């Protein structure tokens, strides 16, 4: 919100088990979720955007839907000329399908590329995902893809695609906070009034590298060591994909906007 107006509509997100359904119910749920996002994006473009440049930002299931949105609504339309960039974080983009998904949208390879896709999936150093497969959307429809195949990635500390280890002393990692919040908030269909905020993590500092085989973003250092001590943590930093890089991400948004205009 330092560089942009934010449009963040709610949508009917598919449940976690939609990704494991052996019938079509899971894919139908994901199609329904996507339809909300496409409708919201159309409303934004037609009523709120006023022909200005825009950024698409999404994480996890949201990133999966953003792949589809960019393919259908942006990549092959005049809107691509107004796309500053798209941060589609925390969901795999297999390298072999990139050209099918985004034939007219480049992969980012520097801090000030525009009209491009930026993606990463973060894990601790040496971690390999034990979940073998996941659903993936392609223009011809849904497929089941191996999680182990090489994915498109950018290192958010260097904004390059090489496998060097990088740190960013100016980065600030954050943690979500909430007052009077309990588990029922997750189940409520209404806003419960819990006051949510963010704060800086007590420990700062780590470095990261793109794994040359998988494309996963591996991280190590003091903050990562602290996260490893969390109960039930298995080595996948998926819940922290954005929080870890909050400071460098905010700066990069400024850099790409400056480059675009």
Region roles according to the model:
Residues 5-10, 55-56, 85-88, 118-119:
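Structural recognition of the beta-strand scaffold that forms the well-ordered cores
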Residues 1-53, 218-261:
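Active-site catalytic motif of lipid deacylating hydrolases and related acyltransferases
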Residues 15-19, 64-65, 96:
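Short catalytic/ligand-binding loop motif for oxyanion handling, primarily in non-cytosolic enzymes
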Residues 38-50, 72-225, 259:
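Surface cap/lid and interfacial helix-loop subdomains adjacent to catalytic sites
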Residues 67-71:
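Short, hydrophobic alpha-helix immediately C-terminal to the catalytic nucleophile
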């Amino acid at each position: 919100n330092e560089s942009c107006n934010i449009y963040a509509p709610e949508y009917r997100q598919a449940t976690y088990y939609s990704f494991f359904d052996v019938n079509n119910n899971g894919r139908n749920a994901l199609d329904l979720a996507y339809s909300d996002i496409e409708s919201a994006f159309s409303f934004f473009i037609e009523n709120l955007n006023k022909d200005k440049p825009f950024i698409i930002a999404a994480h996890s299931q949201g990133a999966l839907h953003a792949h589809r949105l960019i393919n259908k609504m942006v990549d092959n339309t005049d809107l691509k000329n107004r796309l500053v960039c798209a941060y589609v974080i925390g969901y795999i983009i297999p390298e072999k399908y990139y050209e099918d998904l985004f034939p007219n949208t480049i992969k980012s390879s520097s801090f000030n590329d525009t009209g491009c896709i930026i993606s990463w999936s973060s894990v601790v150093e040496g971690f390999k995902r034990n979940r073998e497969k996941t659903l993936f959307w392609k223009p011809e429809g849904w497929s089941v893809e191996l999680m182990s195949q090489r994915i498109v990635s950018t290192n958010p500390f260097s904004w390059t695609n090489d496998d060097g280890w990088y740190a960013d002393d100016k980065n600030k990692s954050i943690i979500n906070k909430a007052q009077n919040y309990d588990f029922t908030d997750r189940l409520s269909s209404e806003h419960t009034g819990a006051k949510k905020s963010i704060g800086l993590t007590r420990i700062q500092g780590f470095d990261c590298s793109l794994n040359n085989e998988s494309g996963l973003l591996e991280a190590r250092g003091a903050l990562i060591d602290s996260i490893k001590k969390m109960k039930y943590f298995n080595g996948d930093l998926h819940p922290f994909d954005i929080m870890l890089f909050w400071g460098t991400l905010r700066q990069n948004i400024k850099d790409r906007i400056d480059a675009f205009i």
